[in-house]
Amino acid sequence: ALVETFKRLGHEVKIINLHNPRISDTYIYHFWRHENNMYLNLKETISCLILRKGIKRENCFKKFINLFPLTRQYEIGDEIDEDFDCLVCGSDQVWNTKIIGERAISYYFLDFGHPLKRISYAASSGSNRFADGNENFFKGILSKFNKIGVREFFLKKYLHESLDLDACFTPDP
């Protein structure tokens, strides 16, 4: 919805195609991960091998994401070398450092490049208090944002109380 809105407003839109193993590995089945529960292991093995559950989910996601205008694929650790006038991040769990992993923080918090503007729209951290113990680091990154929009009242309050940053509430597109 956000991509279409930006296009209707006359902007050229590209989604940065970032491959994050922490995310993509959730589609891969890990045999016998429940050490003490043979029933769960057997159930998940059948689900994976016979029903191809993880494979179907990954293929659906790939088809969906390829509908959008993507940059070339970047890996964690790559320098994003494209010029953008504005960077926008947001939506489900984008600032949940437990999900994205520490090595990916600079990408999901837009700490790269030299855009004229940085904006978050409906950014979410779940219930994760990502800055605990690293307040100065995250305040430095988020202070580069021109506008911060979050989808959770918890996160709006957390940014204000912990990092002294103002955010507005924006609904998830």
Task: Indicate residue ranges for each PLM-predicted region.
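Short, structured coil segments at secondary-structure junctions
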Residues: 114, 144, 162-165
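An acidic- and aromatic-residue-enriched active-site/binding cleft used to recognize and process polar
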Residues: 18-20, 153-154, 172
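A short beta-strand/loop micro-motif in the catalytic core of glycosyltransferases
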Residues: 145-152
